């Protein structure tokens, strides 16, 4: 059984007991969150597709930790002008553990 949820402007395929890294959420570590924006649920042969969300469906998750991702480098360069600019960025994320998929 799996579901497709929407959070942080992205869609994620989730399975029970799976860890999922999403955009930073305002929640404490150890807190349980319920996502109501379930776009699709697949249970064996049964498929429920929402228009746009599945009515009465939810996904329960537990917040495992908050952290920062890998550093990416942004480089700006103009040839022949002796101009070079480099910047780094680390995106905040929330690590979630999927507890239950309620259809």
Curated annotation (Swiss-Prot):
Membrane-traversing stretches: none
Keywords: Ribonucleoprotein, Ribosomal protein, RNA-binding, rRNA-binding
SUPFAM superfamilies: L21p-like
Top-level taxon: Bacteria
MF-aspect GO terms: rRNA binding; structural constituent of ribosome
Biological process terms in GO annotation: translation
Short name of one Pfam family: Ribosomal_L21p
InterPro entries recorded: bL21-like (IPR028909), bL21-like_sf (IPR036164), Ribosomal_bL21 (IPR001787), Ribosomal_bL21_CS (IPR018258)
NCBIfam families named among the record's database cross-references: L21 (TIGR00061)
Function of the molecule: This protein binds to 23S rRNA in the presence of protein L20.
Family listed: Belongs to the bacterial ribosomal protein bL21 family.
Subunit note: Part of the 50S ribosomal subunit. Contacts protein L20.
Name under which the protein is recorded: Large ribosomal subunit protein bL21
Organism whose genome encodes this protein: Psychrobacter arcticus (strain DSM 17307 / VKM B-2377 / 273-4)
């Amino acid at each position: 059984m799996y579901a497709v949820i929407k959070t942080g402007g992205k869609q994620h395929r989730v399975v029970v007991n799976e860890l999922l890294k999403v955009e930073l959420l305002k929640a404490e570590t150890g807190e349980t969150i319920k996502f109501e924006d379930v776009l699709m649920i697949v249970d064996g042969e049964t498929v429920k597709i929402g228009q746009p969300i599945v009515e009465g469906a939810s996904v329960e998750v537990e917040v495992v930790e908050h952290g920062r991702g890998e550093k990416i480098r942004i480089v700006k360069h103009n040839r022949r002008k002796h101009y070079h600019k480099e910047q780094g960025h680390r995106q905040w994320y929330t690590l979630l553990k999927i507890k239950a998929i309620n259809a």
